[in-house]
């Protein structure tokens, strides 16, 4: 008789304790289920998203994990807790290093804190997790952002030029290498001239490489 049924009352304390107990015992799926019950009632609770996110990552649900990390971080930022949001995204970068949005959002928050150098480091750190041909587009985007923050950082520009060449954007790679050559010196210039020659093995490129070898 349906009219006799009663919905189970929302017992927040019971659910929290049950989820914590399940997590402690390694019962991740049970903990996730309990946290989801809580989130069904409190969808914007940053602390609940922070608790469930690593469990989702550990159970190979990266998209759901990132959604929770992002939601929690955004909520903290809206409340003025930018430093806590940075800490949360740092945790996300450990669990989800191959989620490019993690690095982009983390860099955004470092810029919000006026920490340009840290934002640049974050983008380069993220780039290192995208090494394969399949990931090349993510690496290129991160490097373009890093280049905007440090236009004359040699490693950023040199790496970007190499990836552009591999991606088939040889014209852009050549232009970037020529730009680097205009302000770099010595050993770095030799590397630039060598890469220019590899891209365009012309007499002019060969002469530029030779001159860098002799004069550098």
Task: Indicate residue ranges for each PLM-predicted region.
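Repeat-based scaffolding regions
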Residues: 1-216
